[in-house]
Each structure stands twice: as structure tokens, then as C-alpha cells.
Amino acid sequence: LSLGDSYTIGESVCATCSFPEQLKDSLSINFKKDTTFSLQVIARTGWTTTNLINTIEQENITDDFDLVTLLIGVNNQFQQRNFSIYEKEFPELIATSIKAANDKKKNLIVVSIPDYAFTPFGRGSASISTEIDKYNDFAKNYCEQNGITFVNITDITREGLSNTGLVASDGLHPSKLAYTKFVERILPLAIAKLKE
């Protein structure tokens, strides 16, 4: 189960290029042939934490997922929502994610928010980076305090102006290559969790 926003659905890249799809394919390669992986994605471009919470409530998702990923927050920042909303709703989403993951927090992987300052759209804006850091620092600290796996991929996206191959054709979102690099970091942790 992958929860999030445009960074989860893979805005402006092919249907199988998103990080959850690439993760699913990579997991399939690393497990026996008779092991199949299915993927459910609850994500939409523009979603804030509030949008995600409201949709999850309507979706009535099951609570038997072996692996859950959560990547959320960029639209709280982009839409200049009050930071206190994230402070309240990120922990709510963590609790919901754990419930979906068989009530096992070890089955949850939280992924950091990419930094869109390092894209043609973001134009190297220092204020964007500072605000993204604030969100990621909160998420990282919360995860560390609660024994939840947090994977930092933000540094990969901060190479987007020097390595244009990391940015999708829309000049804003990560490319297939960037998502591949995300998966290189997520995959070993996912394999370990699934084999426990």
C-alpha cells in the first residue's frame, strides 16, 4: 500500500515508472517466482495531509498489508498551510498506516519529501528548501522517536539542477531515474521487513 501525492503516483512519468511500481517490480525479482506482489495506491497530485486523511476514511482500506509506504507533505508546504496542520495530521497518518500494515510499525516505511527547489520550476529557491527541511525534520524526528523506518531521498532530488535527468519532462516532478534512485534506498529495507 502506497499513500501520498504526486510523488507517489509518479506525475509526468510512465505508469510503471513511479517509485511504488518500481519497488513492486524490484521486490518481485528478489523473491521466489511463486511470490506475487500486488500494489494499492491512494494518492493524487495536489493532496495535502488533510486530503489524504479524508480519502483514506472513505476508501475503507484493509488492515492486512505486508508493506506500507507514506510520502506526504509537499502540498502543505506549497499551499502554505499552517505548519501546525502537519504536526497534527502526520502522526494521524502514521497511526493509520500502521493499522493498515497489520498493526506492525515495522511494516511501514516513511519516505522524505523531495525538494522541488532544485527543478526548473523551483529555480533554486532557498526558501522552498528551508521549508521542505522543516517538514522533513519533523517527520524524521517523529519516526525516530517512535521506532519507524524513515528513508531520506531529498538529497537525490537536490541534484536536479545539476543533473537534469533527475527531473521529469514537466520541469517539476522527479523522473523515472530519480524514482529508481529512491527505490535503491528503499528496497533493502523493504526486503528485510518482508523476510522478518
Residue positions per predicted region:
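Structural recognition of the beta-strand scaffold that forms the well-ordered cores
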Residues: 1-2, 8, 38-43, 66-72, ...
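Surface-exposed cleft-lining segments at the edges of enzyme active sites
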Residues: 41-44, 75-85, 123-127
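Oxyanion-hole/transition-state-stabilizing segment in secreted/luminal serine hydrolases
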Residues: 49-88, 115
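Serine-esterase "nucleophile elbow" of acetyl-processing enzymes
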Residues: 1-43, 57-63
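Charged helix-capping and loop-helix junction motifs
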Residues: 84-93, 131-135
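Catalytic His-Asp segment of secreted/periplasmic serine-dependent ester chemistry enzymes
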Residues: 115-196
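Solvent-exposed loop/turn segments at secondary-structure junctions
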Residues: 6-9, 44-49, 74-79, 114-119, ...
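A short helix->loop->beta-strand "cap" motif at the edges of active sites that frequently abuts
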Residues: 98-107
